């Protein structure tokens, strides 16, 4: 591994910016008959949010746990809460969510 100096760390920390992390979990209506259709529309909305530059990273979680997904938003906590409240999966009770303020490095991405 590359050795990272204290000076480098201090410099890099000045380059962070605020983001929000959303933890999406199974809601009370997870087993609803219309679940697949609603999740499909939830996914469509995620693509729209990605195209708008608001949802920077979206990661569905499929390990059988209550966690359904993780998203990193380029927006404030209040903006993200409003976005999530309008999500079709949240409105149908398929999902519930938590929003957490965070910081990260602009330009970071998932490897190809």
Question: What kind of feature is each model-predicted range?
Answer:
Residues 1-112:
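Conserved, structured core segments of small domains
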């Amino acid at each position: 591994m590359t050795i990272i100096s204290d000076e480098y760390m201090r410099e890099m920390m000045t380059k962070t910016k605020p983001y929000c992390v959303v933890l999406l979990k199974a809601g009370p209506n997870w087993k609803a008959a219309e679940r697949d259709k609603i999740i499909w529309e939830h996914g469509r909305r995620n693509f729209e949010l990605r195209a708008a530059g608001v949802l920077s990273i979206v990661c569905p979680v499929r390990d059988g746990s209550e966690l359904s997904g993780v998203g990193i938003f380029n927006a404030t906590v209040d903006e993200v809460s409003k976005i999530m409240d309008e999500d079709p999966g949240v409105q149908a009770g398929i999902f519930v969510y938590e929003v957490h303020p965070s910081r990260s490095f602009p330009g970071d991405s998932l490897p190809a």
